[in-house]
Amino acid sequence: MMEMVLPVANATAAALARVSAVFNAPLARAVVFGIHIDGHLVVEGLLIAAILFQLSRKSYKPPKKPLTEREVDELCDDWQPEPLCPPIKEGARIDTPTLESAAGPHTTVDGKEVVNFASANYLGLIGNEKIIDSCVGSVEKYGVGSCGPRSFYGTIDVHLDCESKIANFLGTQDSILYSYGISTIFSVIPAFCKKGDIIVADEGVHWAVQNGLQLSRSTVVYFKHNDMASLASILEKLTHGNKHTEKIRRYIVVEAIYQNSGQIAPLDEIVRLKEKYRFRVILEESHSFGVLGKSGRGLAEHYGVPVEKIDIITAGMGNALATDGGFCTGSVRVVDHQRLSSSGYVFSASLPPYLASAAMSAVNHLEENPSVLANLRSNIALLHKELSDIPGLEIASNILSPIVFLKLKTPTGSAVADLELLEIIAEKVLMEDSVFIAATKRSSLDKCRLPVGIRLFVSAGHTESDIFKVSASLKRVAASVV
């Protein structure tokens, strides 16, 4: 190979030397109007002339010759389109049961009456007559939808009434409604957190929070699940010796009750660390609003922390209030900022008026019937007691959480294998004992680092016999499977 390259290189070098000698020779120089013109100027002039010639030429257009029918058919036969989406992996396939009635404490699944522990209906308000009547009245007055975003003729008086009702109930300055519960948190986080900001989040946050963190494009650091020592260590590292720390917006993002574990966040300790290291707190209360606290006002009431010490509170209204949509509450400044900067508020059609009416009726019911909270806590305690000795499984959730989370005592070492065992248990419980429960199946987009498990949603509408039935069924099936 080298024997072929060397002669070519030598010949090229010799040719370049001759060209250089020619243009530097006296014959290649001229005097025009007293100005000496070297050979390289002649070459540059020729290049300019060539460029102008090329620019002035008309573009070449190949002759238009249409394809024959045979050629068209051949091209169509050879074309292999890419699939619109990748094929579904076997582990991602879900054969979901079909509900044929409202998802109350008792429902119909695939034509069979079952006890329902798979739906979040904490206060047992699904099917409540007063809430249904308020929805009917709202539909008769406003119709079923607003047909526009809040800023474009989508605001109806019932929206403003609901926002005021929630703010007054929680003791905050103002609140703002969102059309869809899960979109609340992943619209609020990007509205306040931008590129260059720092977010410290619990590693166990659910997918909607994860999505908000990703959309914010902020620098996200995770601390160990519900571990305040881990949180304090990370806050110390982020602030110690950082000269620009005062110029960077910093947030702590946690859930009041974690959907992926049923654990309760220690808000008093989080607020102490927040004030020490000068962070802001975004608290997601979808599973604690209407549940925790003496009167159901959430995590702040549960710990006795002044609500104004929490910068931003969000919650979905589908778990305790038996409606849909979500809200964010806090100071007037926090709420007003979202009316122009939150994508889920600005670009979505507003919450249907009848759902806002249902939310207000549910809050009124909670205020007028505080005993519903006692019923809920009694059911949670009873279920914990009955499942304390379940074979092969253990309770990982807090005693006050309406999410009773069961995980394997001895994991297999593979999340896929663990999930298969849990799904077998859930399927057997449904088919053999007519008890509807669900395993925590996660998509490939969910980056939660916690173990999978079986999640039971306890309702104030469940009876003691319901609790005994699900406990006995789970014990029997778990003993045969695990």
From Swiss-Prot:
Main location: endoplasmic reticulum
Catalytic activity reported: L-serine + hexadecanoyl-CoA + H(+) = 3-oxosphinganine + CO2 + CoA
Keywords: Acyltransferase, Endoplasmic reticulum, Lipid metabolism, Membrane, Pyridoxal phosphate, Sphingolipid metabolism, Transferase, Transmembrane, Transmembrane helix
Subcellular location: Endoplasmic reticulum membrane
Known EC number: 2.3.1.50
Taxonomy, superkingdom: Eukaryota
Alphabetical list of SUPFAM superfamilies matching this protein: PLP-dependent transferases
Topology in the lipid bilayer: Single-pass membrane protein
Entry function: Serine palmitoyltransferase (SPT). The heterodimer formed with LCB2 constitutes the catalytic core.
Name of the protein this chain belongs to: Long chain base biosynthesis protein 1c
Species per Swiss-Prot/TrEMBL record: Oryza sativa subsp. japonica (Rice)
